[in-house]
């Protein structure tokens, strides 16, 4: 599952410091253009890609460090891989030709690396500063701000407009509860130590520090064993499906609340 700080993040380079305030998050999906590019423009772009023009200006491979296991939230990046990709399971990475529009060879390769457990739970900025060959990295707004004093990064793209970070629970254990603030005061909230949003939730009185257990490692065993009798971090685009469809020993819907809807509006992937 994600992280899930996990649990999603703008892609960043390792240049100048980021802003110290979070960017606003749109609550609706961005409009999709209804017209196509002019034929001559598309042809020119395809010709440039076919000539491998990026080889003259880009490193190869272009290394992208993600913030978690390979998952749907990273889909746009994995879509850049050509059909010749090779998975290196021992190093939690995949490498292949970088293609544009799913078919145009750009002349360089792309290597995508997993984060989270694969990097010892380090923040992406920390990993990037240890390895200068990393070209881009997934990080959240709050993660970038947190690391900005010693490891500044520049945000260059946003993958999702609304943060899918959630806290979830079994609705059978907490009938009628729809928000985290409605959970009993002694309900444990299980997260990873990278979950920086927790400090805000505690500061706002949404959860109490005594409830927080920073021991989440993306497994399903505890949630299954305790039948979801506590709050746990996740992604709306990930864990609900995993627990209901891919975890037969649980096999039912979870209830959750987005941290965005709690008022914590940041970019994440």
Please provide the spans of the model-predicted regions.
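A structural signal for short loop-to-beta-strand junctions that line the ligand-binding cleft
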Residues: 62-63, 151-160, 165-166, 178-189, ...
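Short coil/turn segments
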Residues: 67-71, 161, 170-174, 188-196, ...
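Immediate post-signal peptide segment of exported/extracytoplasmic ligand-binding proteins
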Residues: 7-10, 23-63, 148-149, 173-186
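Bacterial signal peptide processing site
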Residues: 1-4
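Pocket-flanking alpha-helical
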Residues: 73-81, 94-154, 165-178, 197-201, ...
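A local structural motif
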Residues: 58-62, 85-118, 130-133, 186, ...
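Extracytoplasmic "Venus flytrap"
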Residues: 54, 61-83, 117
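Pocket-lining segment of extracytoplasmic ligand-binding domains
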Residues: 142, 217-222, 227-269
């Amino acid at each position: 599952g994600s992280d899930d700080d996990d649990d999603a993040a703008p892609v960043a380079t390792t240049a100048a410091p980021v802003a110290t305030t979070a960017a606003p998050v749109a609550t609706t999906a961005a409009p999709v253009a209804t017209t196509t590019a002019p034929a001559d423009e598309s042809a020119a772009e395809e010709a440039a890609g076919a000539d491998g023009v990026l080889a003259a200006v880009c490193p190869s491979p272009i290394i992208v460090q993600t913030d978690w296991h390979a998952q749907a939230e990273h889909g746009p990046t994995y879509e850049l891989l050509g059909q010749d990709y090779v998975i290196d399971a021992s190093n939690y990475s995949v490498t292949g030709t970088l293609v544009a529009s799913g078919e145009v060879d750009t002349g360089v390769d792309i290597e995508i690396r997993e984060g989270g457990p694969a990097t010892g739970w380090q923040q992406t900025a920390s990993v990037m500063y240890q390895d200068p060959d990393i070209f881009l990295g997934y990080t959240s707004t709050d993660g970038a701000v947190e690391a900005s004093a010693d490891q500044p990064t520049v945000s260059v793209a946003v993958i999702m407009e609304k943060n899918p970070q959630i806290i979830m629970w079994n609705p059978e254990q907490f009938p009628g509860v729809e928000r985290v603030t409605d959970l009993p005061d002694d309900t444990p909230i299980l997260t990873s130590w990278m979950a920086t949003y927790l400090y805000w939730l505690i500061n706002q009185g949404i959860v109490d520090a005594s409830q927080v257990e920073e021991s989440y490692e993306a497994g399903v065993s505890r949630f299954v064993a305790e039948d979801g009798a506590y709050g746990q971090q996740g992604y709306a685009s990930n864990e609900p499906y995993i627990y209901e469809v891919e975890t037969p020993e649980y096999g039912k819907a979870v209830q959750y609340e987005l941290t965005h809807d709690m008022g914590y509006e940041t970019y994440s992937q």
